[in-house]
Amino acid sequence: DVTIERSGNGFFLARAEWKHYLNKPLITPREGNFAVSRRFYAVNKQGNTFSRGEPRYAFKAGELVMTELNLKAQKGSEYLLLEDMIPAGFEPLTQNEFAELGDFRYDGYANSPAAVTRLDDRVALANTYLGKDSFVPRAFYRAVFPGKYQAMPAQGGLMYYPDTFAYSASDVITISE
């Protein structure tokens, strides 16, 4: 039990910090008709030009971060949905920041999502037709809160057949000040 008491008048400010650790291993990928993988990259910006840095799992607060998802499926699959769970400590980019990325938002037309929806806990990337054997869209975030976090797996599959899905492994991400 934690008890906080106050005596006297005036402004009162309290701060509490809680850490919780599970003694469980990281989530391993689930594959079936599909396979999903995810990599994190720092995004380098020089003027109005953006480039992908090396894959890594440690970032500094304020850094622009890209996740590249890879959904492997049978060529010709239709109505695919990939969901990238927003890692704790990160924020999705604003619409203006996202627009500044221009063509860097996707790698070729085949990997351009038909729709992108940003929700509180995930970014959903949809594709209507798979012209190759994989769909590799990108999602962008900003590292905000320092800490060490376990990122939930990305998941994907057919929109209208929810039993056909796969998910990636979970990742451990570190954000420093």
Residue ranges and their predicted role:
Residues 1-177:
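Long, domain-scale non-catalytic interaction/scaffolding regions in large secretory-pathway
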